[in-house]
Amino acid sequence: MTPVGEILSREILATGPIRFHRFMSAALYHPELGYYRKARDPFGRLGDFFTAEQIQPVFGILIAQCIRQLRDEMADKNDFIVVELGAGRGEMSPALGDCGYIGVDHDRGAMPESFCGVVLANEFFDALPVHVVKRTDAGFIERRVDFADGEFQWADGPAVSGALAEYVERFAPEAEIFEVNLDALEWMKRIQRSLRRGFVLIIDYGYTQRETIRFPRGTLMSYRHHSALEDVLAAPGERDITAHVAFTPLMQCGLETIRFETMAQLLLRAGEKDQFAAAMAANPQQLKTLLFGMGETFRALLMRGEK
């Protein structure tokens, strides 16, 4: 059993089944043993997954151009900074060389108290811990994680309540099982408190309210050595765990939605022909993956905020 698994199994045996949010938080973000906190680098060829920047360097250049275009729309350009959520290894920072830059992680670093600029969240929200809800004949219940016979297992928990019940009342999809990302809504509140004037650009894979029918049993997946695995309870701390982003609740958080489109549409709007020609000449397969693989799967949500 993994070290995180030892911790969680002892907790469950002592106190009973735990929320999946607790399980995912420990698996990914335990201070010493979590997937994203260990010395091992999860990114790249030797890791478990690639980000868009790692697949094709032109991605960072194009996103930087998009951000500069947004900066040009603002009157107070001198105070403009970019706050990147989930900065990872900081690959975006060099491309944003002429902009002020602050990297903020899931539980490290803090949002500036008041700033003008852009909040960039590239593949950030999909790695936030989520709650899991199940639709039953008696109503909605929260799924829990139990430990029995030497392994972690799903268990039915109590009826949803509090903020979880409020979310379900507003956004419950037509699905038997689905994820609820309350942490994402908390991050949007932080952004609204901190962003005096500017934009929020979220790039991630996900769905709108109308598209939830495609995922009748939810979207949770784990990743190991570039393979997608459905058993998200196995080997906590050794695998990445993700859930698709529900974009509709983010659009209703109080900011103005400017555009919601595919990542490919965003990149094609930001780029110039010679940049794509150079990228195609350097590595045509990588550019095709960026534009027609990830580019069609990933969504880009651009919002504006002003106090």
Tell where the protein language model's regions lie, with residue ranges.
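Rossmann-like AdoMet
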Residues: 1-111, 115-116, 262-265, 274, ...
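A residue-level signal for conserved active-site and pocket-lining positions in enzyme catalytic cores
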Residues: 27, 119, 250
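Conserved RecA-like P-loop NTPase ATPase core
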Residues: 59, 119, 204
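Generic detector of well-ordered alpha-helical packing
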Residues: 85, 106, 124-127, 205
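Conserved acidic residues
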Residues: 116-117, 198
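A mobile, often basic/glycine-rich helix-loop segment
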Residues: 118-121, 126-168, 213-224
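Long, Lys/Arg- and hydrophobic-enriched amphipathic alpha-helices
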Residues: 162-307
